[in-house]
Design a protein with these regions (language model features):
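Cell-envelope/extracellular polymer assembly enzymes that use nucleotide-activated donors
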Residues: 87
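Surface-exposed interaction regions that form or flank ligand-binding interfaces
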Residues: 1-84, 95, 121-212
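Active-site beta-strand-loop-beta-strand hairpin of nuclease catalytic cores
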Residues: 90-119
C-alpha cells in the first residue's frame, strides 16, 4: 500500500448466512400449505430483499478505491449473553464503521423525534406506517460490540476503549433500495449524518476518515 500502489480492499466472509436461510425457507415452502405457505412466502421476500441490499452495499465498498478491510455478516456475543448480527464492519486506517443495511420498500420520513414513517403506494392509494427505528437497532449493535471489546481487553485497555470507543467506531444505517426517497428535513443533525443511501456510502466514509 505504498506510493502509487492500488488501494487494497479485503473482503472477509463474503458469503452470507442469509442465503442458507433462504434455501431452507424455499425447501419448507414446498412442504407447506395454506396460511403457513403464505407466511413462508413473505419471509422469503424479506430475506431476498435483505440479500439484494447487502449485495448493493458490497458492490459500493468493492469500488471504493480506498484501503479497507470488510467483514460481512458478523455475529458478536458478550459474556452476559447479549448478541448482535452486524451486516458489515468496515475497517479503515482511522475509523471502524458498523454498517446496518436496510433494503426498505417505500419512501421514508424521519421526524424531529427520530421516528421512522414509511409510505407505501398501492396504485393511486398510499399507506403510512411507523417502522422500528434502524437507528435503535444500530445503536444496540454498537453497544454490544463495545462491551465485547472491553471484555476481551485487559483492564487498562478496557478503560481506554470505554472512554474513546466513539472516536474510532462509527455506526451507519445504509438504505440500500435505490428507489427509496428519504425525507429527513426535520430529523436531527446526528441522525441525518448516520442514515444515508447506498450511493452515498463511499463518499461518507471518505469524508469521515478525512476529518477524523
Amino acid at each position: 500500500m505504498g506510493l502509487f500502489s492500488k488501494p487494497e480492499i479485503i473482503i472477509l466472509k463474503e458469503s452470507n448466512d442469509a442465503q442458507t436461510y433462504l434455501d431452507k425457507l424455499k425447501s419448507l415452502q414446498q412442504l407447506a400449505s395454506g396460511d403457513l405457505q403464505n407466511q413462508i412466502q413473505k419471509e422469503i421476500a424479506l430475506t431476498q430483499a435483505g440479500i439484494i441490499g447487502e449485495e448493493n452495499i458490497l458492490f459500493e465498498l468493492k469500488h471504493s478505491n480506498m484501503d479497507m478491510i470488510v467483514l460481512h455478516d458478523i455475529y458478536i456475543e458478550t459474556h452476559s449473553g447479549l448478541g448482535a448480527q452486524i451486516d458489515f464492519i468496515v475497517i479503515t486506517a482511522k475509523i471502524i464503521f458498523l454498517i446496518e443495511c436496510k433494503n426498505l420498500v417505500g419512501n421514508i420520513e424521519i421526524d424531529s423525534n427520530g421516528a421512522f414513517i414509511r409510505t407505501i403506494f398501492y396504485g393511486h392509494t398510499k399507506q403510512k406506517e411507523g417502522i422500528y427505528s434502524p437507528i435503535t437497532q444500530s445503536q444496540r449493535h454498537y453497544e454490544v460490540l463495545k462491551e465485547a471489546r472491553i471484555e476481551t481487553s485487559n483492564w487498562l485497555k478496557g478503560i481506554s476503549i470505554k472512554y474513546n470507543f466513539s472516536s474510532f467506531y462509527k455506526p451507519l444505517v445504509v438504505l440500500a433500495n435505490p428507489k427509496t426517497i428519504v425525507n429527513d428535513r426535520y430529523a436531527k443533525k446526528e441522525i441525518k449524518q448516520q442514515v444515508i443511501r447506498a450511493d452515498q456510502l463511499v463518499a461518507t466514509i471518505k469524508d469521515m476518515v478525512a476529518h477524523s
